[in-house]
Curated annotation (Swiss-Prot):
Keywords per UniProt: ATP-binding, Cell membrane, Magnesium, Membrane, Metal-binding, Nucleotide-binding, Phosphoprotein, Translocase, Transmembrane, Transmembrane helix
Enzyme Commission code(s) on record: 7.2.2.-
Binding-site residues for Mg(2+), renumbered to this chain: 643, 647
Lipid bilayer topology: Multi-pass membrane protein
Keyword Zinc part of the UniProt annotation: no
Induction of its expression: A member of the dormancy regulon. Induced in response to reduced oxygen tension (hypoxia) and low levels of nitric oxide (NO).
Any matching Pfam family: Cation_ATPase_N
GO cellular component: plasma membrane
Protein name, UniProt field: Probable cation-transporting ATPase F
Transmembrane regions listed in the UniProt entry: 64-82, 88-104, 248-268, 281-301, 716-736, 738-758, 778-798, 808-828, 842-862, 872-892
Localization of this protein: Cell membrane
A biological-process GO annotation: sodium ion export across plasma membrane
């Protein structure tokens, strides 16, 4: 067999016997063991490429990959070369602390993901040399004959050669929520993947029936493999925070190195000692660099990650925490994300009228009501009773309990009918005793119905369900609520069907009749005209309970929500209307687009159409990927949610991919940045809120650290330029940076979220971290800080203090001003006093720790010796606190003035 045959042939377009010949196999005996071994060597194992995880060393080294860290490493090395070992130790200590924190948090995220992974190896039933074997799916090769039965996971792409009532749930691959009834009939070559009824795809689940198929593709050549390739090809988009921090760090690095070079140059021009000037230039660089920034970013994101984990959202990559906060569009998969992925009967129509079934999910608790919400006793309505019995007994599904959760084994549609009967009091196990099945006509795509014969005491009864029009052909009468039979009103039944389908419901008809003859005589020839129509059962995969409120919250936050699904447009529209994506009135033109309509759009029309529409139905994985790319090209920050294999490429392409942890596939989880452990779309609302809070706190830290670091650097530059003694020594600057960044700045990461955080629009993705307001605030505070430090330093010297005492005063002034300024940075929109002193207890703890540290460096002899400090008296402290208070008043006034001007007269 040619190695290219399997990959290039449209097997769905050929008759089954031609596919068998093409692959040199046998429809009953399969391949020989020898031929299978040769093909395994030629084609390789039936596996997808394994994603290589970063090694321990690579993950450690990644923590040092930051421009600011590079500068600190160089500065530390040069400082050590100059034999300033204390300074070098402090610099390297800051770098190591940052690396440790980052590594620990990344490891925690990876461990959380590992806990979600289900390491399951599938097996397949294969016929070789006429004998059935069970073997690992990895050993399958093109041409193998595979047997399928209900509950099996399809192990490779199969061209079916025979089947009986075979149905396959392809929702993980195509997004369609209802199982696909398979057959072996050849199809046109251009038939879309979702409509290829004669192919069973790798990774999908057999829900009913049995069959056999020839393997036509394995591993990377399967449709699942094609999606895997799309995942690998999808561009990993930098998060808004990552991109901004990268630019910001490069800008700071260049600016700080420029200032250091300027300092060194000025010192040389003034003929100062080259080594001392060089040391001062390094001190300026170290002082001006916000070395706490990488650590602050890591810790702030880690805190956000921990908060999200408590709300059942596991973050795989730390920057994803902030990305949700800047999201402008959420693309949500319908099945299993906005909906329960549990087909549920919503309404039962009988010739007597419509009856609503309350409740969702598989738990057997329900109330049957009429349209006026009045309870309907089952035994008081014969048609309702027999419709429920038909749905429960003419059924191959099973309702099982897994711990506290109820699950369906088999076809979801049959499961829905089984569940509603159980909810109405008809226990499936008891029915197997009171109405035992003695014969059956299984469902097939040609027959379009299923009928079963049951023993009812000494008589027999026929129960059936199927497509409405097919069941109408089988029914000659209809049953009333009193059990009386009357002529079938076909037109009324069709109108009721149209009414139910217009609500996005899938409708099946039920019927019953008296069984004649023996079970051996029961076949499809005895059914036509012998049944009485008992009702219509209308079902859907209902929206999650909190989906509508979550969508509304996203809209209030200025975030557009779009549904992307492989399901039919009618079903998608109905769900979208229920959750608030579409108005209850007729959807506006262009608000719902199908995959075919998307394919017909020109390149110029495509971006605007995608931006305008709210629902995308019958879309392929490639189209999902292109949709995300088009939205990103329009300037959107895109979050994509999903749980299926078909979602994986778009999950990876999106700025943040959100996978479902409970019902999601492993492919989707691996492609995602965040995994929701409760599979609840509403959790995304909480994640967006946390993400916005994270960015707020990062902004507060930057607002605090930039002026203080710049002030430290400018003090040295000014001293070199003027040619006087340094007000603060390099070692003292390192002390300030090391202690205040940890004890003061990092405490801002624990600030609670601001009021109204979910009522403001998303942040402009193009807005830089270094805004005009921040530049002005930085210049204001750093100027005040430098001026006050110089004033106090000069005052102390002029009033008889020694150089050590004057520098100690300036050192403590820097720290106290930074502590006071910290409170001003707790909110960028409100007064610090309105927040409450104890709203963030970490601030109080940090300030207290910093106070103890300042006492130690000022009054402990050992610290005095290392840092060249000296004790200062109470009068100096009074001056320090007076200056800090004055600066705080100036900053508060600067914060309030814009709001005062903005108020109407």
């Amino acid at each position: 067999m040619s190695a290219s045959v399997s990959a290039t042939t449209a097997h769905h377009g050929l008759p089954a016997h031609e596919v068998v010949l093409l692959l040199e196999s046998d429809p009953y005996h399969g391949l020989s063991d020898g031929e299978a071994a040769q093909r395994l060597e030629r084609f390789g194992p039936n596996t997808l490429a394994v994603v290589t995880r970063a090694s321990l060393l690579a993950r450690i080294l990644r923590q040092f990959h930051h421009p600011l860290i590079y500068v600190l490493l160089v500065a530390g090395t040069i400082t050590a070369g100059l034999k300033e070992f204390v300074d070098a130790a402090v610099i390297f200590g800051v770098v190591v602390i940052n690396a440790i924190v980052g590594f620990i948090q990344e490891s925690k995220a990876e461990a959380a993901l590992q806990g979600l992974r289900s390491m399951v190896h599938t097996h397949a039933k294969v016929v070789r040399e006429g004998h059935e074997h069970t073997m690992p799916s990895e050993e399958l090769v093109p041409g193998d004959l595979v047997l399928l039965a209900a509950g099996d996971k399809v192990p490779a792409d199969l061209r079916l050669v025979r089947q009986t009532g075979l149905s396959v749930n392809e929702s993980a691959l195509t997004g369609e929520s209802t199982p696909v009834h398979k057959d072996e009939v050849a199809l046109p070559e251009g038939t879309p993947v979702a409509d290829r009824r004669n192919i069973a795809y790798s990774g999908t689940l057999v829900t009913a029936g049995h069959g056999a198929g020839i393997v036509v593709a394995t591993g990377a050549e399967t449709e699942l493999g094609e999606i895997h390739r799309l995942v690998g090809a999808a561009e990993v988009v930098a998060t808004p925070l990552t991109a901004k921090l990268a630019w910001f760090s490069k800008f700071l690095t260049i600016a700080i190195l420029g200032l250091a070079a300027l300092t060194f140059g000025v010192g040389l021009l003034r003929r100062q000692d080259a080594v001392e000037t060089f040391t001062a230039a390094i001190a300026l660089a170290v002082g001006a660099i916000p070395e706490g920034l990488p650590t602050a970013v890591t810790i702030t994101l880690a805190i956000g990650m921990a908060r999200m984990a408590k709300r059942r959202a596991v973050i795989r990559r730390l920057p994803a925490v902030e990305t949700l906060g800047s999201t402008t569009v959420i693309c949500a998969d319908k099945t299993g994300t906005l909906t329960e992925n549990q087909m549920t009967v919503q309404s039962i129509w009988t010739p007597h009228g419509e009856i609503r079934a309350t409740g969702t999910g598989y738990a057997p608790d329900v109330l049957l009501c009429d349209t006026d919400d009045a309870p309907v006793p089952v035994n008081a309505n014969a048609a309702l009773r027999w419709s429920l019995l038909a749905g429960a007994c003419s059924n191959d599904a099973a309702l099982v309990r897994d711990g506290t959760r109820w699950q369906i084994v088999g076809d979801p549609t049959e499961g829905a009918m089984l569940v509603v009967a159980a909810k109405a009091g008809f226990n499936p196990e008891r029915l197997a005793t009171t109405l035992p099945q003695v014969a059956a006509i299984p469902f097939s795509s040609e027959r379009q119905y299923m009928a079963t014969l049951h023993r009812d005491g000494t008589d027999h009864v026929v129960l059936a369900k199927g497509a409405v029009e097919r069941m109408l052909d089988l029914c000659g009468t209809e049953m009333g609520a009193d059990g009386a039979l009357r002529p079938l009103d076909r037109a009324t039944v069709l109108r009721a069907t149209e009414m139910l389908t217009s609500r996005g419901l899938r409708v099946l008809a039920t019927g019953m009749g008296a069984g004649a003859g023996t079970p051996d005589d029961f076949d499809e020839n005895v059914i036509p005209g012998s049944l009485a129509l008992t009702g219509l059962q209308a079902m859907s995969d209902p929206p999650r309970a909190a989906a509508a409120s979550a969508v509304a919250a996203c809209h209030s936050a200025g975030i557009a929500v779009k549904m992307i699904t492989g399901d039919h447009a009618g079903t998608a529209t109905a769900i979208a209307t229920e959750v608030g994506l579409l108005d209850n009135t007729e959807p506006a033109a262009g608000s719902v687009l199908t995959g075919a309509e998307l394919a017909a759009l020109s390149a110029d029309q495509y971006p605007e159409a995608v931006d305008t529409a709210s629902v995308f139905a019958r879309v392929s994985p490639e189209q999902k990927l292109r949709l995300v790319q088009a939205l990103q090209a329009r300037g959107h920050v895109v979050a994509m949610t999903g749980d299926g294999v078909n979602d994986a490429p778009a999950l990876r392409q999106a700025n943040i991919g959100v996978a479902m942890g409970r019902g999601g596939t492993e492919v989707a989880k691996d492609a995602a940045d965040m995994v929701l452990t409760d599979d609840d779309f509403a959790t995304i609302e909480a994640a967006v809120e946390e993400g916005r809070g994270v960015f707020d706190n990062l902004t507060k830290f930057i607002t605090w650290t930039l002026p203080t670091n710049l002030g430290e650097g400018l003090v040295i530059l000014a001293a070199i330029a003027v040619g006087v003694a340094l007000p603060i020594l390099p070692t003292q600057i390192l002390w300030i940076n090391m202690t205040t960044a940890i004890a003061l700045g990092l405490m801002l990461a624990f600030e609670p979220k601001e009021a109204g955080i979910m009522t403001r629009p998303p942040r402009d993705p193009d807005q830089p971290l270094l805004t005009g307001w921040l530049v002005r605030r930085t210049l204001l505070v750093s100027t005040l800080l430098v001026a006050s430090a110089w004033w106090l330093f000069a005052w102390e010297l002029d009033n008889g203090a020694g150089l050590h005492e004057a520098r100690t005063a300036a050192l403590n002034l820097f720290v106290v001003v930074e502590a006071f300024y910290l409170f001003s940075c707790r909110s960028l929109t409100r007064s610090a006093w309105r927040l409450g002193m104890f709203a963030n207890r970490w601030i109080i703890l940090g300030v207290s720790a910093q106070a103890i540290a300042q006492f130690a460096i000022t009054y402990l002899p050992a610290m005095n010796m290392v840092f060249d400090t000296a004790p200062i008296d109470i009068g100096v402290w009074v001056r320090i606190f007076a200056v800090a208070t004055a600066i705080t008043i100036v900053v508060a006034t600067d914060t309030l003035l814009p709001r005062i001007r903005a108020q109407p007269p």
